[in-house]
Amino acid sequence: MKNNLPIKSRLLYKRLLSYVKPFWPVLLLGVLANILYSGIDAGFTYMTKLFLDKSFITIDLDFVKQIPLIVLIGITLRGLVSSLGSYCMTWVARSVVKVLRQTVFSHIIHLPADYYDEATSGQLLSKILYDVEQVAQVSADALTDFIQNICLVIGLLTVMMVICWQLSLMFLLTIPFVGIIVNYTNKRVRRISHKVQKTMGEVTEIASEAIEGYRVVRIFGGERYEITKFNKATEYSRKNDMKVAISKAINVSGVQLVIAIGIAMIIMAAIHLSTVITISAGSFLAIIAAMLQLIKPMKTLTTLNATIQRGLAGAESVFNLLDLPLERNNGLILKDKIRGEIEFKHVYHAYRQGQNILHDVNFVIEAGTSVALVGHSGSGKTTIASLLPRFYELSQGMITLDGMPIQQLSLESLRKQMSLVSQNVTLFNDTLANNIAYGRFDASREQIITAAKLAYADEFIKQLPDGYDTRVGENGVLLSGGQRQRIAIARAILKDAPILILDEATSALDSESEHYIQAALEQVMNGRTTLIIAHRLSTIKHAHKIIVMQHGRIVEQGSHQELLDMDGHYAQLYKVQQFGRVNEEVVV
C-alpha cells in the first residue's frame, strides 16, 4: 500500500496549483498588491538618484518641495497594498489547507482496512495536521514572500540597469554563483525535511500510544521507558531541525558573500573606469543603495527556499497518501432490505499476499438463522467476519448474499444490511444518545430509548447526571466495560439491519449482565441472520449451527448437541471450558 516514490518539484507545484485554482481571483488580487508593493520600494530607490542630483548638483527647488508629499503618498500606499496582499495570500492559503485537509481526511476514511493494519494513528494524524500545515507555508507565507521579494529584486535590477547598465552587468555576473548555492541547499533541505516529517509522525505516535494506554504504562512501570523513548524521538527531531538550520545558514552566508563580492567589484570598477563610464554621484549612490537593498530580498529568498522545500516535502507526503487506491466501491445499489441468506463458496484468504489464513471455507447461513464460529485464536473466525462486509477483498472464492456475489454490490448497500458488535467497542466523545444513534441520525429519542432498554442500558443511563445527554469521553472512558458493550449492542439494535455480526459481543459483561444481554440478543436475533464469534461456548448453545475452525479450515459443523455427540474438537473445547468454569466457581 505504501507509495514512497519521489515526486518531481514541477509536478508538485502543478498539483498544488490545482488546489489554488478555485481561489484565483483573490490570489490574483494578492499578487498584484505584492507587485505594487515591490514596485514602490524600487521606486524609492530610484528617487534616491533624483533627490541627490536635483538637491546638490543641479538644484531643482520645485522638485525638492514635492519630495515630502511623494514620500507620504508612497509610504501610505505601500502600507495599504502590503496589508491587502498579506490578507489575500493568507486567505488563499487557509482555504487551500481547509480543502486539502478535508480531502485527506475523506481519503483516509475510505482507505482499505489493510492500510489501517500498517499505519498508526500517530502517523495519520501527523499527515492531517503537520504535513498539510507545511503546505500552508508554501501556499501563504512562502508565496507572499517569494512574490514580494522576487518582484523587488527585478525592480531593483531594473533601476540599476536604467541608471548604469555597464556596472549593473558586473553585478549580474554573481547570479549564477547564487544559483549554485541555492541548488545545493535545495536538495539537502528537501531530503532532511522528509526525515523531519517521519520523525514528527513517530513523536505523535509515541505520545498517542502512551496517553491512550496510560493504565498499562503505569501498572507495568513503563513511565521511564516511555519518557526515554519520547525523548529519543524528540532529540532526533531536534537534530534534523538543526541540519535544516545549518543548511539555511550556509545558504544565507554564501549568498551574502557573493553579493558582497559583487558590490566590491562595482565600486572598484567605478573607481578605475571613471574616465570611461560617466556617472553622477546620485546615480552611483543609487546603484550602491540598490545593491545594498538587494541583500535583504535575496537573503529572504534563500531562507525561503528551506520553507518551500519543507512545504514541498509535506505536499509530497500528502499526495502520496492521496494516490493510494480507495476501497473498491462499484456495484449494485440495493433499495430494499435483503432476506439475509449468506453462502461462502471455496473461500481462501491471505493478508497482503502472505500465507493463506482461510483454506477452502464452505458453509451456508440460512436467512433468519444464527451460526456461531468457534475455535482457538488465529483459527480464522474474525477473518470470516471481516470478509462479509468487505473490510478485506477475497483472495479466492465467492461470498454471496441472497445469491448475489458481494463484490457486485456497492459497499454502502452491502454494509447497510449489517450491524456489528465487536469485542473492541468504539464510542465517540459525544452524548450517549448520539452514540446509540450513530449511523441512524434521524432516529427519534423514543427509538433510542427502546434500543437501550432492549440492550439493558436504559437503567444505568438514567442514573447518570445528564441521562442520554451525558458525554461519554474519548472512546467511552467514563463508562465501564460492560456499559460500553451495552451501548454498542443498543446501537446495533437501533440500526435494525437484517444481518447481525456479534464478535465476542458479551465478552466484557459480568455474569448477571451477560444473562440479561443473552436474553435480549435472543430476541433481537429472532428473524435475523446472525454470525456469532465466541470463545465462551456457553453463550452459543442455542445457535442453529456451530462451525468449528482450526488453522483456517472448517473441521466440524452442526448443532451444539450434534457436536457433543461427535466427541470431536468441539466436545473437547466444551469440556475444557466447563472444567475451568467449575474450578472458578469453587475458588469463588
Curated annotation (Swiss-Prot):
EC top class named in words: translocase
Entry binding sites for ATP: 375-382
Organism field: Legionella pneumophila (strain Lens)
Keyword vocabulary terms for this entry: ATP-binding, Cell inner membrane, Cell membrane, Lipid transport, Membrane, Nucleotide-binding, Translocase, Transmembrane, Transmembrane helix, Transport
Domain ABC transporter: 342-576
Domain ABC transmembrane type-1, chain residue ranges per copy: 28-310
Function: Involved in lipopolysaccharide (LPS) biosynthesis. Translocates lipid A-core from the inner to the outer leaflet of the inner membrane. Transmembrane domains (TMD) form a pore in the inner membrane and the ATP-binding domain (NBD) is responsible for energy generation.
Reaction(s) this enzyme catalyzes, per UniProt: ATP + H2O + lipid A-core oligosaccharideSide 1 = ADP + phosphate + lipid A-core oligosaccharideSide 2
Any single Gene Ontology cellular-component annotation: plasma membrane
Residues passing through the membrane, by range: 23-43, 56-76, 141-161, 162-182, 257-277, 278-298
PANTHER family: ATP-BINDING CASSETTE SUB-FAMILY B MEMBER 10, MITOCHONDRIAL (PTHR43394:SF1), ATP-DEPENDENT PERMEASE MDL1, MITOCHONDRIAL (PTHR43394)
Enzyme Commission number(s) from the entry: 7.5.2.6
A GO MF term: ATP hydrolysis activity
Organism lineage: Bacteria, Pseudomonadati, Pseudomonadota, Gammaproteobacteria, Legionellales
The keyword Transmembrane appears for this protein: yes
Highest taxon in the source lineage: Bacteria
Protein name per UniProt: ATP-dependent lipid A-core flippase
Cross-referenced SMART domains: AAA
Primary location group: membrane
Domain comment (free text): In MsbA the ATP-binding domain (NBD) and the transmembrane domain (TMD) are fused.
Keyword Cell membrane: yes
InterPro entries membership: AAA+_ATPase, ABC1_TM_dom, ABC1_TM_sf, ABC_transporter-like_ATP-bd, ABC_transporter-like_CS, ABC_transpr_lipidA, P-loop_NTPase, Type_1_exporter
Gene3D superfamilies xref list: ABC transporter type 1, transmembrane domain (1.20.1560.10), P-loop containing nucleotide triphosphate hydrolases (3.40.50.300)
Family assignment from sequence similarity: Belongs to the ABC transporter superfamily. Lipid exporter (TC 3.A.1.106) family.
UniProt subunit comment: Homodimer.
Compartments in which it is found: Cell inner membrane
Short name of one Pfam family: ABC_tran
